[in-house]
Every structure is written in C-alpha cells, then in structure tokens.
Amino acid sequence: MAQQRRGGFKRRKKVDYIAANKIEYVDYKDTELLSRFVSERGKILPRRVTGTSAKNQRKVTTAIKRARVMALMPYVNED
C-alpha cells in the first residue's frame, strides 16, 4: 500500500509572466523580456519551468528564434 508523505510542502503555482503583466505582443526586439525564458546556456526553457501558457510559450519561442536570426540573442552561451 502507498504511504502518505507527512510534513511535505505545497508547490507554489507558477504564474504566467506574460499574462500577469498583460503583455499582448511579445516583441523579438525586447531581449530583456526574452532572456527570462532562456537558460544560462542559451536554451529555451520549457513551459513546466517558466509556467507560461501554451499560447504564450509559442509566442515566446517564435520571438526568441527571430531574435536569434537577427543576431539580437545568441544561439548558444558558452562561458
């Protein structure tokens, strides 16, 4: 039988940053906003990490890819 965990902690619900701040258009030129959704290695973070909705994640992904093509953001950060 499965044992119930005691003294566990509640996970905090992740909030969609874009919806919370009422951002309607995710601009590829806004690298400060886009850098919130990119790891330190330069990879796009998944929804389960950032807490964004599916619709906003698609907007963020296309904006990051456009910024990379326009050389506003790096493809890979190697430190």
UniProtKB/Swiss-Prot annotation:
Its taxonomic path starts at:
Bacteria, Bacillati, Bacillota, Bacilli, Lactobacillales
Q: Which organism is it from?
A: Streptococcus agalactiae serotype V (strain ATCC BAA-611 / 2603 V/R)
Which NCBIfam families does this chain map to? S18
| Described purpose of this protein according to its UniProt entry | Binds as a heterodimer with protein bS6 to the central domain of the 16S rRNA, where it helps stabilize the platform of the 30S subunit.
The protein's matches in InterPro entries, at most eight in alphabetical order, are given as: Ribosomal_bS18 (IPR001648), Ribosomal_bS18_CS (IPR018275), Ribosomal_bS18_sf (IPR036870)
Key word Translocase present in the record? no
Give the family per the record. Belongs to the bacterial ribosomal protein bS18 family.
Keywords attached to this Swiss-Prot or TrEMBL record, sorted alphabetically, are: Ribonucleoprotein, Ribosomal protein, RNA-binding, rRNA-binding
This protein's source sits in the domain of life called: Bacteria
Subunit relationships = Part of the 30S ribosomal subunit. Forms a tight heterodimer with protein bS6.
Specify whether Oxidoreductase is a keyword of the entry. no
What name is this protein filed under? Answer: Small ribosomal subunit protein bS18
A single MF term (Gene Ontology): small ribosomal subunit rRNA binding
An example GO biological process term is: translation
